[in-house]
């Protein structure tokens, strides 16, 4: 049994600095085809991928994201929940399918489909020697992204992905993940608070030491402190409104 794929995914880390080398059309096609091979719920294929190489569009999206690598990359992918095709089928159907694709379950199916496709693309890109970084920051202004990309109803931008050749060999490193015993529950969920607190304390120490070493002492925050800062910042509170404007979560 080969550990090639295991070792590949274990090395994953976000890359935020890329060489100024655009991906070829052949590479883009292969990445998309790899993404399409991902599992999809009930064969709905409730997603689409928008490829961006137009510099003006990239710049407009950078203004939403606030991140330079939205522009400075080899290629930019945008992943969307897409029920527009299903809506067109619905126009000639005898049943009202919108009850399904306009539901909360429909949202989950589309989001999961898009994520599975994107992960396939990410792993394939890394196998080719490229680096990637996911871009949830495009949800900072969903309405503006929908305008930039001319998205119809029943299509919702979930996240993006910048891909390209890493600018150097030291362009990031894999962060220590939560230990195996923290995330793997055998047969049932184990919610004992004392055990959870002890595990988090150990992990907080690991993360603090990681940042301390990586930044020569400039950062020492724990994982818990990061979570408090991120989840305590009440951002993107308009998601439900934006989803409903797109024709999703109507029930």
Curated annotation (Swiss-Prot):
Any one GO MF annotation of this record: oxidoreductase activity
Cofactor(s) in the UniProt record: FMN
One Pfam family of this chain: Nitroreductase
Enzyme class, broadest EC rank: oxidoreductase
Coiled-coil region list: none
Keywords: Flavoprotein, FMN, NADP, Oxidoreductase
Domain of life: Bacteria
EC number: 1.6.-.-
UniProt keyword Flavoprotein present: yes
Function, as annotated: Reduces FMN, organic nitro compounds and disulfide DTNB. Involved in maintenance of the cellular redox state and the disulfide stress response.
Protein name per its UniProtKB record: NADPH-dependent oxidoreductase
Organism this protein belongs to: Staphylococcus aureus (strain bovine RF122 / ET3-1)
